[in-house]
Structure formats: C-alpha cells, structure tokens
C-alpha cells in the first residue's frame, strides 16, 4: 500500500475513534465521588420503583388476602417455583458475607441483576389496569435501569485493578410480566416477579452503597 493511502486510512480511523476517545477521557476526569453519587441516585430510584410497583400490585389485587402465608412462603422460597434468578448467583446471605466480597465482585453482581431486568421492565406498566399512580412510562423505567447499567460499568472501569472476574454469568433473563391479570397463574407469576424485582433492587442499592463507602468515604456505617 502506498504511503499516502496508508496515511489517509490511519487519519480516517483516528477521526472515527476520536469521539469515543474523548468520551472515555471525559469519564476518567469525572471525580469518582460524582460517579458514585449518580449511580446511587439511580439505584435508589430503581429500588423505590420496585417497592412502589410491588405495593400497588398487592393493593390493586388484594394479594395479601388472595394468597395464604403458607402459599406465599412456598412460592417465594421453593426453588421449583421461585422466579428469583438472583438466587442462583453466588452472592451473600448476610451483611458479614457481603463485606467479605471485593468491590468488583459486588459491582459485577449488581450489573448482572440489572441486565436480567432490562427486557421485562419494558412491559412493567402493562401489568396494571390503573397507571395513574405513576408519572413514568415503560420507556422511562427501561432507561432508568439502562442508565444504572452504564453507571455501574463506568465504576467497574474506574476501579479495575488488573484482575479479571471469572465465574458465573447470568445469561438467563426474567420473563415478561403476564397481562392476563384475571388468570390465577398469571397473578402468582406477576407477584413472584415483582417480589424478586424488589429484592434484587434492594441488593443493588446495598452493594453500591458498600462499594461507595469503601472507595470514597473510607469508612462504612453498616
């Protein structure tokens, strides 16, 4: 290849990559404390979304009276019926075990939980017959989790210590919510999915808070 052609190709490649390089450089200049602040804000909003959605579903369909305590326990804790894929992730069962995990491990688990929710959350609102409680749409819910996913990825990039995480990846994703709300099985399915959504987002917010206090604040009040 002629020298002039090679130079032209290199110049074209550099111009194509320039926006990405500028963006990557910009991320590196953002204070770590600010990245954590934004991620924690998104995580709190996602957790609150999960709580509000679960509570409205319970209230709208009278699920507390609809399902006995025995049925609820069996449905949520029986591995044959549980909808919580996060139960298959090698995570911690208590705060002491959580504190023993590295920052990257906690961020990695949080990322898996978020990614497992991206597709089904698109159809979250269609589960309900009354959306007046909410001022957000399916699209807003999706972009909330998408922003949180990107924020966690940025944090992982900034905290990368040269080690490579190996182990389980959560290739499974949660199924869509069932809009056939008058069907008994559909009600149970949606109940389980929303319970797990609340449980998973609580984990994400807790894990991010722990990584934040280790990385930025220097002390943890857990």
UniProtKB/Swiss-Prot annotation:
Organism of origin: Homo sapiens
Name of the protein: Chorionic somatomammotropin hormone-like 1
PANTHER family, sorted: CHORIONIC SOMATOMAMMOTROPIN HORMONE 1-RELATED (PTHR11417:SF67), SOMATOTROPIN,PROLACTIN (PTHR11417)
Highest taxon listed in the record's lineage: Eukaryota
Cross-referenced Pfam families: Hormone_1
The keyword Disulfide bond appears for this protein: yes
The organism's taxonomic lineage, starting at the top: Eukaryota, Metazoa, Chordata, Craniata, Vertebrata
Compartments, record wording: Secreted
Gene Ontology biological process terms from the UniProt entry: animal organ development; growth hormone receptor signaling pathway; positive regulation of receptor signaling pathway via JAK-STAT; response to nutrient levels
GO cellular component, one term: vesicle
């Amino acid at each position: 290849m002629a020298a002039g052609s090679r130079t032209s190709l290199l110049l074209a490649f550099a111009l194509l990559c320039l926006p990405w390089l500028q963006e990557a450089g910009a991320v590196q200049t953002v204070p770590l404390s600010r990245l954590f602040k934004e991620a924690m804000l998104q995580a709190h909003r996602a957790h609150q979304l999960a709580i509000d959605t679960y509570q409205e579903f319970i209230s709208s369909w009278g699920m507390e009276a609809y399902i006995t305590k025995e049925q609820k326990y069996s449905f949520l804790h029986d591995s044959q019926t549980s909808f919580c894929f996060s139960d298959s992730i090698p995570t911690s069962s208590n705060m002491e075990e959580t504190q023993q995990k590295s920052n990257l491990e906690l961020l990695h688990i949080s990322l898996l939980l978020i990614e497992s929710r991206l597709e089904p959350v698109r159809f979250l609102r269609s589960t309900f017959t009354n959306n007046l409680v909410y001022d957000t749409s399916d699209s807003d819910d999706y972009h909330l989790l998408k922003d949180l996913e990107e924020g966690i990825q940025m944090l992982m990039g900034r905290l990368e210590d040269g080690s490579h995480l190996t182990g389980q990846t959560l290739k499974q994703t949660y199924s869509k919510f069932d809009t056939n709300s008058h069907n008994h099985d559909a009600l149970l399915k949606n109940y389980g999915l929303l319970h797990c959504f609340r449980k998973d987002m609580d984990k994400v917010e807790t894990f991010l808070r722990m990584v934040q206090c280790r990385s930025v604040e220097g002390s943890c009040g857990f």
